[in-house]
């Protein structure tokens, strides 16, 4: 049986961080409906509670019956000063009505210490508590391990502890993030391969950025090494140099690698221009 790769589109969230990309709620709805026709598995609609456009999107998209896609809401782990059940960010995800909640957390020990000013063990508790809290109220919870590859190269033991914490708390898939876009394909493939041995029970996904023009290549080799979920955007739109381009990745995985991605691959021909057109309007 052909392996199915889970496609997770973040055009409506990470893609909107690109320069001069401003999408209204109607724009987001139109793009989401096109992505659903395309056969995308998950559409990350935005960060609930962060701005009026995203709040309106989650309310409006609930009025549509989607054929293929499930809607995901994005957010962060709970604030260190908040009790998990009182954290407005997590409660906004739950209130969004989205099927899936995806939260990010620090997977680099240095960032936990210097950016969050937290004891690394406290960071693990925050990740564990945040995932477990969402899991009680949302059908599906995913965890984005921010700066994973940089963190792993500095302190592999700690980064592995982060993945274990998220998995044990109930995260269905953990997405390994090349947040700075600086990891080379050979080292990324080796790390993912090592994780398949160290954590065989953990389902992995991949989220790459294109600062070194490696986002597509890194995504492909991650899948070849065992990643099951691919995060990216249409046309690679995203902050700085962009995200992994799903319009390049999907044909490679489906045609060159023989993996199942889309129900109707020909849809790529008319889906690709959509976000670019709206972003420029």
Predicted regions: what is each one?
Residues 2-79, 83:
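N-terminal capping/small domains of soluble enzymes
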Residues 12-26, 75-83, 114-119, 147-156, ...:
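Active-site mouth loops of central-metabolism enzymes
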Residues 15, 35, 101, 143, ...:
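Conserved, mostly hydrophobic/aromatic
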Residues 26-38, 86-103, 107-113, 121, ...:
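Alpha/beta enzyme core
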Residues 41-65, 74-77, 106-117, 147-150, ...:
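Glycine-rich, proline-tolerant flexible connector loops at the mouths of alpha/beta enzymes
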Residues 55-76, 125-137, 191-204:
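Alpha-helix-loop-beta-strand connector modules within alpha/beta enzyme cores
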Residues 214-225:
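Catalytic cores of alpha/beta
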Residues 270-281:
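Single conserved hydrophobic/aromatic residue that forms the stacking wall/gate
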């Amino acid at each position: 049986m052909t392996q199915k790769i889970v496609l997770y589109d973040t055009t409506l969230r990470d893609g909107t961080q690109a320069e001069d990309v401003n999408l209204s709620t109607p724009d987001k709805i139109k793009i989401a409906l096109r992505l659903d026709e395309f056969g995308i598995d998950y559409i990350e609609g935005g960060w609930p509670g962060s701005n009026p456009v995203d709040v309106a999107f989650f309310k409006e998209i609930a009025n549509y019956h989607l054929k293929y896609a499930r809607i995901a809401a994005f957010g962060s782990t709970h604030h260190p000063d908040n009790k998990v059940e009182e954290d407005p960010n997590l409660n906004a995800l739950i209130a969004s009505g989205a099927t899936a909640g995806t939260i990010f957390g620090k997977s680099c020990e240095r960032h936990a210490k210097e950016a969050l000013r937290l004891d690394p063990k406290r960071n693990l508790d925050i990740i564990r508590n945040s995932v477990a809290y969402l899991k009680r109220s949302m059908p599906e919870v995913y965890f984005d391990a921010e700066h994973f590859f940089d963190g792993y190269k500095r302190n592999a033991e700690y980064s592995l502890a982060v993945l274990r914490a998220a998995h044990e708390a109930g995260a269905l898939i953990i997405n390994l993030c090349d947040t700075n876009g600086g990891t080379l394909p050979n080292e990324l493939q080796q790390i993912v391969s090592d994780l398949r041995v160290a954590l065989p029970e953990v389902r992995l996904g991949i989220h790459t950025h294109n600062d070194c023009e490696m986002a597509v290549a890194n995504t492909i080799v991650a899948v070849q090494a065992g990643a099951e979920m691919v995060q990216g955007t249409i046309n690679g739109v995203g902050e700085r140099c962009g995200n992994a381009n799903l319009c390049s990745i999907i044909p490679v995985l489906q045609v060159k690698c023989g993996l199942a991605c889309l129900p109707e691959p020909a849809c790529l021909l008319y889906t690709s221009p959509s976000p670019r057109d709206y972003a420029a309007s």
